[in-house]
Amino acid sequence: KSGKFLDGEINIRIGESVRGCDCYIIQPTCPPTNDNLMELLLMVSAFRRASAKRITAVIPYYGYKLEVGGQSMQRSKNKESTAAIASADIAQMLVTMGVDRIVSVDLQPPGQGEIEGFFANSAPVDCIEATYAGVEYFRPIVSKDAVIVSANPTCTKKTRDFQSGLLGSGYR
């Protein structure tokens, strides 16, 4: 159970024994990003303290991933900056709190693929590609005259993959 104390701090309570269990926490870190992230970290901690055998964090939206491959990441690689790399810091926080595995959707920004490396060998990362699930969902309901447009240039490949999936699935 997740709630808040009167002062706004997050309060996590586990309502049953999870000792020796495989536990799955489903929590996106979308806006309000920081609140959702803190809730996730505290849930992982609560399950770990309750002696869960394994904790898998299912994070449909992994917040702070947009900086990966961007300006701050490039500066950090060149050691020209001391800026934080939030994606790496969040990965470290999750592992420190006790997560054993991460499952996310479209984890890396298109064309990047670097976030999984932030977890090193400490927590395996599974990335589910939404494109293929989207094809299965939209194929029966999208008109053959539909126009598929990319939100921005970095998403062009995903858009083409989605279109190809529809065309390859009998979409005409």
For the regions a protein language model found, what residue spans apply to each?
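PRPP-associated nucleotide enzymes
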Residues: 1-172
